[in-house]
């Protein structure tokens, strides 16, 4: 997935390089399919699409449901209000740990991680655990001691680790999120929004290890060196009774209330839901996820090779080169939506042309909003036309 910054650079390149844009608008019927990301990027971050549908009635102070693959917003309610996030903080803790360290690296539990306030897996000073084991302790039992151990082992202190969490949030383009610790105990300088927590979660779900851990109902790790002696149970009730549920994290403090981030896959759709300060999070998430699966579908936009453009080639052995989409494309859209396809095609390209190069773009729109852009790649290499004896001497 391209970052917002890279997308802006891409649009600038298109504006500079495309002298003449030819637009072809065609209606595409919507039907089920599966997303393939190669050569395709949805408009995310600042360009993320919000379908403008209010979340179903629920008791949460803030709520949002997004398409995990694109970040497009399916439903939301007060999604940009800053709130405490309790132990859903640990999603960022896990993300940062997975990105910065070998999961099989073994650590000795530091003294700072023993007896930490709140939920605990009762770590003992000096006991050996791998990062993988600590991550299971972190995400299943929500161990604040595990969060502290990860922070101290990877960054030297919880304070330094929190600063790294803030740097990662900044990289993700988040402007309303700040971390003061790795575990989520209430702090006035520790907050996020439902929207930005959903973005963090979508980023974390890109990693197979993270997905594996948050989908696990129960697990065993070492306890003070004894294999499989520490029994862990996931606190996320949705994993035990909701069809397709595969993550991610619960949270609670007296100040922040009950927080929950959940995810589920069904019928080709991959959905993330977030609620902050909700007295009935499990019930709310069932309602939100049901509404998403009932109202949206993974819509097939184009089969592989279905979108084509012919581009004139200057000084080429062939006068034209064909460009097409190398992968099929599907997107999570409201049921019954119809899309428009616009082609961005240069007036011409110069030889030589290399097979597989991006030469044009296809833009899909729903109700006038651009929802994804697809690279159209050349299907053949075109060599530069050899000049005749007279052309070499006298020019064209």
Language model regions located:
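N-terminal Lys/Arg-rich, disordered targeting/topogenic segments
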Residues: 1-11
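Sec-dependent N-terminal signal peptides of Gram-positive bacterial secreted proteins and lipoproteins
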Residues: 10-32
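Active-site-adjacent loops and short helices of periplasmic peptidoglycan-processing enzymes
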Residues: 2, 32-195, 199-208
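Domain-terminus/edge residues, biased toward the C-terminal soluble/receptor-binding domains
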Residues: 174-175, 186-191, 195-396
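Generic detector of short alpha-helix boundary/capping microenvironments
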Residues: 10, 14-15, 51, 58-59, ...
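Short, compositionally biased leader-like segments
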Residues: 25-42, 323-337
């Amino acid at each position: 997935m391209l970052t917002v910054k890279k997308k802006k650079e891409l649009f600038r390149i298109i504006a500079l390089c495309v002298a003449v844009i030819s637009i072809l608008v065609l209606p595409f019927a919507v039907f089920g399919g599966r997303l393939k990301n190669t050569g395709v990027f949805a408009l995310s971050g600042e360009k993320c699409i919000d379908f403008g549908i209010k979340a179903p009635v629920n008791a949460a102070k803030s709520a949002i449901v997004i398409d995990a693959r694109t970040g497009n917003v399916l439903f939301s309610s007060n999604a940009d209000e800053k709130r405490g996030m309790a132990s859903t903080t640990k999603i960022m803790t896990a993300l940062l740990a997975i990105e910065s360290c070998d999961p099989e690296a073994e650590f000795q539990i530091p003294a700072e991680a023993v007896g930490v306030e709140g939920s605990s897996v009762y770590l003992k000073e000096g006991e050996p655990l791998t990062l993988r084991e600590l991550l299971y302790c972190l995400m299943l039992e929500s161990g604040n001691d595990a969060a502290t151990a990860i922070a101290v082992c990877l960054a030297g202190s919880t304070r330094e680790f929190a600063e790294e969490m803030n740097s990662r949030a900044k990289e993700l383009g988040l402007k309303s999120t700040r971390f003061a610790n790795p575990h989520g105990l209430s702090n006035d300088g520790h907050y996020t929004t439902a929207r930005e927590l959903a973005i963090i979660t979508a980023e974390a779900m890109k990693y197979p290890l993270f997905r594996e851990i948050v989908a696990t109902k129960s697990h065993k790790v070492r306890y003070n060196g004894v294999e499989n002696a520490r029994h862990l149970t996931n606190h996320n009730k949705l994993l035990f009774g909701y069809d397709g549920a595969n993550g991610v994290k619960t949270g609670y403090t007296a100040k922040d209330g009950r927080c929950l981030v959940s995810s589920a896959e069904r019928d080709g759709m991959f959905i993330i839901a977030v609620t902050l300060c909700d007295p009935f999070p499990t019930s709310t998430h069932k309602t939100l996820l049901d509404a998403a699966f009932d109202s949206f579908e993974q819509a097939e936009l184009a089969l592989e090779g279905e979108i084509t453009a012919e581009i004139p080639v200057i000084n080429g052995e062939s006068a034209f080169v064909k460009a097409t989409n190398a992968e099929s494309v599907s997107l999570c859209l409201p049921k019954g939506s119809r899309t428009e396809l616009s082609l961005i095609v240069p007036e011409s390209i110069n030889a030589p042309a290399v097979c597989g190069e991006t030469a044009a773009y296809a833009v899909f729109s729903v109700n006038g909003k651009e929802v994804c852009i697809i690279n159209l790649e050349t299907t053949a290499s075109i060599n530069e036309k050899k000049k005749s004896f007279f052309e070499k001497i006298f020019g064209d």
